[in-house]
Amino acid sequence: MRPTEACCYLKISLIILFYMGCYAQKHPNMDIAVILVGTTEEVAIKDVHEKDDFHHLPVTPRVALVTMNESDPKSIITRICDLMSDKKVQGVVFGDDTDQEAIAQILDFISVQTLTPILGIHGGSSMIMADKEEASMFFQFGPSIEQQASVMLNIMEEYDWYIFSIVTTYFPGYQDFENKVRSTIENSFVGWELEEVIHLDMSLDDIDSKIQNQLKKLQSPVILLYCTKEEATYIFEVAHSVGLTGYGFTWIVPSLVAGDTDTVPDEFPTGLISVSYDEWDYDLPARVRDGIAIITTAASTMLSEHNSIPQSKSSCNNIQESRVYEAHMLKRYLINVTFEGRNLSFSEDGYQMHPKLVIILLNQERKWERVGKYKDRSLKMKYYVWPVFDLYPNSEEHKDEHLSIVTLEEAPFVIVEDVDPLSGTCMRNTVPCRKQIRPENRTEEGGNYIKRCCKGFCIDILKKIAKTVKFTYDLYLVTNGKHGKKINGTWNGMIGEVVTKRAYMAVGSLTINEERSEVVDFSVPFIETGISVMVSRSNGTVSPSAFLEPFSADVWVMMFVMLLIVSAVAVFVFEYFSPVGYNRCLADGREPGGPSFTIGKAIWLLWGLVFNNSVPVQNPKGTTSKIMVSVWAFFAVIFLASYTANLAAFMIQEEYVDQVSGLSDKKFQRPNDFSPAFRFGTVPNGSTERNIRNNYLEMHSYMVKFNQRSVQDALLSLKSGKLDAFIYDAAVLNYMAGRDEGCKLVTIGSGKVFATTGYGIAIQKDSGWKRQVDLAILQLFGDGEMEELEALWLTGICHNEKNEVMSSQLDIDNMAGVFYMLAAAMALSLITFIMEHLFFWQLRHCFMGVCSGKPGMVFSISRGIYSCIHGVAIEDRQSALDSPSATMNNTHSNILRLLRTAKNMANLSGVNGSPQSALDFIRRESSVYDISEHRRSFTHSDCKSFQPEENLFSDYISEVERTFGNLQLKDSNVYQDHFHHHRPHSIGSNSSIDGLYDCDNAPFTTQPRSLSKKPLDIGLPSKHPSPQIGDLYGKFSFKSDHYGAPDDLIRSDVSDISTHTVTYGNIEGNAKRRKQYKDSLKKRPASAKSRREFDEIELAYRRRQRSPDHKRYFRDKEGLRDFYLDQFRTKENNPHWEHVDLTHIYAERADDFKHDTSCSNRQHQKHVGEFVQTDRKHGSGGNAWEKNMSNIEWEDRASSNFCRNCPSKMHNYTGQNTNRPACIRCEVCKKAGNLYDISEDNSLQDLEARPIQAPNSKYPQSPNGKAQKRNRSKLHRQHSYDTFVDLQKEDVTLAPRSVSLKDKERFLDGSPYAHMFEMPNETSFTSKSHGPTHNPGGYMLSRSLYPDRVTQNPFIPTFGDDQCLLHGSKPYYFRQPAIGGLKGRADFRGAGKSLSAQHSGPSGHFQKDICIGNQPNACVSNNKNPRSFNNSTNGHVYEKLSSIESDV
């Protein structure tokens, strides 16, 4: 016996003696048999325990040591039964040195039969046994099938072997093994791939060929095998024949296959991995001791709880019921055992819950080597990279297919993370990488390492290169240093790993430089980098002058120069010299006292525009100045927008950033010159430090004390203010700046790079991998995959913002464009200024058709547009337009002529700056005319110049177009139209008509009211202050049945081009049309409404019922007298007939007028223009004021009827009707009834030359009298457009009169409108004449659109319009008691008589017609007959219908 064996045997003897000594004590004893099967040498290798190991337990174990050499089932059963009979054994600890799993089956059978706990601690007794009996009390020191399958999968997961196959025989437990593997991979997050599952039947004949055929299906690199050791020997032999046991294939087997580690079959391949029970750290004496402790501890627990322990078994037969109960109770305690702090519990199947397992590897020496340990569900392997090349002696030829690659953690190129806590492995987008830990007391069995997961920009590149080049790899992290630095001739870091050939490649943020290229090969750079500088933002302050900083001083000065000197002066000059500007109107006297446009106003206007201030400004009127202001407004938009956009960068609290130009900057080269000193550093042992050391030695020596251990430490130092700048690789710094929280870290110059280089892959020198790797990298660039990776990994959230606040002032170069625009606008304005004057003074009249005598281009275009819109046919032949066939029923022809007339009115000379002064055409009318209506005086109709407008008759034309569709072509629908002056601008405006004495008075800013068709009593200022003339307007009773006259029927051939909205019907009874009228007033110009607003008050006052003993006087009598004296005073260059001295009327009117009753019945009317013309014809000696007519003569005149269009007497008139029919016309007028007959003047002149015999009056209230001949002036008819030019060339002595009372300077001499306001030259007043009932000349209306007289003007409004609209103003009359002759009279006839008497002059004779104001029928009739309304009026006032001639 060898000494060692004797020593082990002595130890076991001492243990037995110890337990026997415990038996002698009073504690209850537990008999336990320890059976060891094997040779003497094996049995002798045992250990001895301390005597006091179980001293603390209440049950004392009594151990019996039994050794035997036979391992057959019969010998084992016989030996155990003998021990039970002899020793009363209560428990068995069994160990053997065989690989026979049959021993475990025999022991399981004995435990079921004897209900004795048996523990298999070694050899065959501890091997896997499937399908134990239900009542079995056999426990094994070993892992179960499921536990071993889990460890095998953990090994594969550790080395990322996810593709595998399963090969099993039909040995019991194979289904459990297969099911465990399947359930694990199905419930795992790891991407397992189970390719094949093969079941081999070892009992078949010709098994070799069948196994070969099945094994040939295997293609996976990892194969899991479950079988017995004998079956495995045969399977490996067949697998070797088919090439499945060499390089590239890894077999993993359970402990059942490995068996006894001391015996290794030759068929087992090298590199075989097995899961085995730990025999290195858990030897047989320790197992024996733990076996005894488990049984003793369970019995002690049972004793403490139940005060009993299982009784010993006397034999293997006759099992008592009490024994069964006690056995089951003991098994429950055996499952849960803890001894000396170690968990020795078992599962229900009898396997240890926490077995001590190891992973063993069959190395090249054909010995089992422990390469890993599995404890507490944690696997630790010896090799962080599987030593595949060390296992196969002929594997040099396969080294190119599996590579070991080293890397270095540095985001974003390599990012290291922990494994997934749920699965314990890496996710799919990561790659397993291992970091080795080298402890000081490292054992021979190998070092420790930590499994991590790597991802990042370089890892993705590595995966794509490996897929392209087709190689596998194991990745690990470098431990000795960083990128690599040569220290004392030895390289460390990743370069050192490649140089020492521990790694084939180095992948990461490895900079290519010359020194490294001498020892390793670099691939082409996959990213460009260099040296960059990172700084931290620091808060700043806002400057007090920040609001001026958006523009430089030059821009501010230039803007004010352009504003004050250039633009404002230019606008002022253009406006001053503009023909339609403010100052030109002042210079021409067209707007005395009106506004002026000064240079101060120009500056204020431009200042308000450039700063967008809502201030009251005065806009220019000239076209050139408007263009200049418009361009300035565009300049202001650009200027203000640029200022506002750039202001935000200066008004915010700016963040200060240190600016450096490069490594040569003085902040780096002379950092101590600054206060405080500039602090900067880098990470040592890198290419950045090497570059600085080689090129800037002083800089390197200064920065050493500020160097940082890592990039993360440097970032913290920057944020905390310990470091002012950090110098490092540009790619890394750009990534860190983009991912920085708060974006406080920035790289200077938005990532400016110095000493540009790149990152590459380091490869072993002359290994042959460089070309393949270069081609793979270039392919990534070509496919665009490299750009995708850069966008994925190298872009941060802060990259979307500006890294620095780089605000700069806008200089002249930035704003030059807008100043160029102003200069171009100045040049364009000069050209426009010249063209404006050229057109205004030279070309304007030609465009309007004055030069050619034909319709101008503007009119032609307007007519064409109107024709296209309204479908009106245009007559091409001029004769067709002017022929008599174009009668009143020809609507289209009349429309065309109306448009031509409107065009002619718009093109009148004297409008819009005509060189002919308007003062030359002021018409002086009678004083009676001016007395009746101050505000309608021709001489003083406006105190301020008329402001020309673009379309003078726009309101008239729009009124015609608006009312055309509602006109009826029936003579029964007759009316008399009203003429309104052109609308003034606004009440109180600079262009409004001022009063006779005060231009600011409201009545003189309004339009006159028509007084036609109603006899009015005229109140003149009395010579004596006590008596007063009654209210002229208040004498009317508008609803009286006696309101009428022979001329009462309204003529239907007169046109209305007024500013009134024309309707017809009862105002009160027709609410709908009244509402339409009100709505139209809302759309009227403000000027058209304002006149009516004032007239409504005045007319309401005048319509108020008055007593007959009241009369009116004008307030300023003396001023009125002086006005008329000056009006009729002869002036230079004016004919005598325009100045008639009427002062004798006022001087002699008192008593003669008052007591003369011969004129009380005067009813005929005489226009002022008639006796003025008569006065010119007969001279001063035959003044019309001195002639009188008797009552008989007046009655004779009244008994005759006259043509409605001319002064011809109708001899066949019966005189039965009180109202003269509107259809009565003489033969000559019927012949000349063509509206546009150009020869009608000749026929009318002949007609005027014939004497007229008035028949006896048939009026019921008028006495018969003789007719008196009347001296008549020549009748001037207005002409159609065709003769317009010819008439202009004639020397017409009569001064023209504008259609609008306000626009006096519209017409030149010879204009077709020269006779518009001229009354027929009737016979002057005679001393014996009585008021005739009718004056045919006073109410003549022309069918021409260019009438001869005011009563023939189709555009003059009638009094009926004012009846409906009731406009007025406050009265300007005094009331005083009427003269005695008017007492008791409520109507206006008495007032008319008194008024006539006062006007009769010294001789007591009166004029036939007393004319009042500028009214369409301006003569007051003294007709006694009551005037009645139309039979259909029912006493109501009717609004008129608009018309364009009677046939429209």
From Swiss-Prot:
- Its membrane topology: Multi-pass membrane protein
Encoding gene per record: grin2b
Binding-site positions, L-glutamate: T511, R516, S687, T688, D729
Q: Which Pfam families match?
A: ANF_receptor, Lig_chan, Lig_chan-Glu_bd, NMDAR2_C
- Record GO biological process: excitatory postsynaptic potential; long-term synaptic potentiation; response to magnesium ion; response to zinc ion; synaptic transmission, glutamatergic
State the SMART domains in the record. Answer: Lig_chan-Glu_bd, PBPe
Q: What is this protein called?
A: Glutamate receptor ionotropic, NMDA 2B
Annotated tissue distribution: Detected in oocytes.
